[in-house]
Amino acid sequence: MSQALTLARPYARAAFATARDEGAFAPWSDALAFSAHVAADPRVAALLANPELGRDDAVALLAPVTHGETYSRFLAILAESHRLPLLPEISGMFDALRADAEHVVKANVTSAAELSAGELDAIKTALRKRFNREVEVTTAVDASLIGGAVIDAGDVVIDGSLKGKLARLQTALAN
């Protein structure tokens, strides 16, 4: 996985620089997400590994209908370099670069029960204050947390779940 990320990084940066120059973060993000989704399909991955598949055919297979010429050239470069299987990593890195440029933190909030609108707003406000950035939150429910929530925002994980507190208490008592 780390090798794939290392190989994908320069392509993600190049795509990001191009999108920034074109002022087209959203279209590039959408196109990369589409291409990554298609490339991740096992049947398509097998087809992309076939040396008889031409560059133009690979680009036609992976490019969304509403893409620009620059995006087609980007896919062609990936095809020529045999890097099309890296599209999921490239897409993820592009989105991370975009979020950083737009001063947005993406946070995943996993709670033991469904959060109310007020609770979610309070979490967003606290995260906005902590990171001094806009916050995009996705939520999930995991009953095994027993109570509370786990917030994963970038490099920061805040475990306020009862399951986490019990695990820390057990570790403290064992020492």
Curated annotation (Swiss-Prot):
Full protein name? ATP synthase subunit delta
Lineage, top ranks:
Bacteria, Pseudomonadati, Pseudomonadota, Gammaproteobacteria, Lysobacterales
Q: Origin organism of this chain?
A: Stenotrophomonas maltophilia (strain R551-3)
Pfam families for the chain: OSCP
**Main location class:** membrane
Regarding the membrane, this protein is recorded as:
Peripheral membrane protein
Q: What GO molecular functions are on record for this protein? A: proton-transporting ATP synthase activity, rotational mechanism
The yes or no answer to whether the keyword Secreted is present is: no
**Carries keyword Coiled coil?**
no
User: What are the annotated disulfide bridges?
Assistant: none
Q: Which GO terms describe its cellular component?
A: plasma membrane; proton-transporting ATP synthase complex
SUPFAM superfamilies attached here?
N-terminal domain of the delta subunit of the F1F0-ATP synthase
Cellular location of this protein? Cell inner membrane
**Chain's role:** F(1)F(0) ATP synthase produces ATP from ADP in the presence of a proton or sodium gradient. F-type ATPases consist of two structural domains, F(1) containing the extramembraneous catalytic core and F(0) containing the membrane proton channel, linked together by a central stalk and a peripheral stalk. During catalysis, ATP synthesis in the catalytic domain of F(1) is coupled via a rotary mechanism of the central stalk subunits to proton translocation. This protein is part of the stalk that links CF(0) to CF(1). It either transmits conformational changes from CF(0) to CF(1) or is implicated in proton conduction.
The entry's family comment says:
Belongs to the ATPase delta chain family.
